Amino acid sequence: MGCPVSRGGSPGCGRRIAEELRLAEDARLRLALLGRCIVKGSPAQVRKELRAELKAIDAEWRPVIARESLRKELDAIDAEWQHAITFWHISRAIIGSIELSKELDAIDAEWRPVIVRESLRKELKAIDAEWRPAIRLESAYRAIIGSIELSKELKAIDAETQHAVELRRALRTIEGRIELSRELKAIDAEWAPRIAQAKEIAQARESLRKELNDIDAEWAPKIAQAKEIAQAKAELAAATDALKRAADKLQALGKMGTTSTPGTDLIGVVTTAVTTTLAGTQPAPGTDLVGVATPSTALGQPAPSTALTSVAAEVATPSTALGV
């Protein structure tokens, strides 16, 4: 049996049951205690105590008895109304199912296009998966045909515009050449004075080089002779020093004659050398070019005639030759 107040097995029902069990245990203990008292006391006193104890037990159990009677009544009412309650639950369930059906119908009506689209999409995907090889083949075939047609059209366009393209290329080439010619002419006009000046300088250098080569060829023997004369002059100076030292020794020893002096002997030797040298020389020619140095001047040496004259002047007197 369920709880008379809380009929669903709630925590309140458990507490009441525990309370009833506690009261029953107390009544049992009291009855046991009363039984022991009956054994020990007189019957009148025992009846009095028993009556008082029963009244106390009735007072304590009256609410429990009332609840028990109320529970029995409720159980009877539940039994009477069970069919009505069941019918009510069934009607509620039917009404709920009807409302749920209406809501589901509304949802179906709302989602029907989506469902249809989804089903169509699935069917189309299946069709695509089935026809994909054929579609690819057709696409490739169309691409090949399109490329062939496009190639033909491009070739036709190239054939039509070939002359125009060639003419445009030739025109661009001519324009480029004209622009290049203008630039080159401008460069030539800008650099013409410098080029002419450079040519004149090159010609002047060439003519000067030829003249210098001619002068070098003309003066080469004289330059060689001047070198020989310089070498002879050095040798003559060395010989003069040797003769001077020898004459000094002879004079110191008194071996020289009274009629001969170191100066006269040396004059004879030098005169012979100078006469021989002057016989083989010629007068220096005049300068043909104004401002052009002679080879001897370029070599840093005096002219041959000047060299011989200086040698003769140095040995002209005995005192000069002997260093007196």
Swiss-Prot record:
The keyword ATP-binding does not apply. Its main location: secreted. GO terms for biological process: biological process involved in interaction with host. GO terms for molecular function: actin filament binding. GO terms for cellular component: symbiont-containing vacuole. It is found in: Secreted. Keywords: Coiled coil, Secreted, Signal. Residues 195-255 form a coiled coil. Residues 1-32 form the signal peptide. Associates with actin filament appendages that are formed in the inclusion appendages of the parasitophorous vacuole during infection of the host erythrocyte. This is Appendage-associated protein. It comes from Anaplasma marginale (strain Florida). The gene is aaaP1.
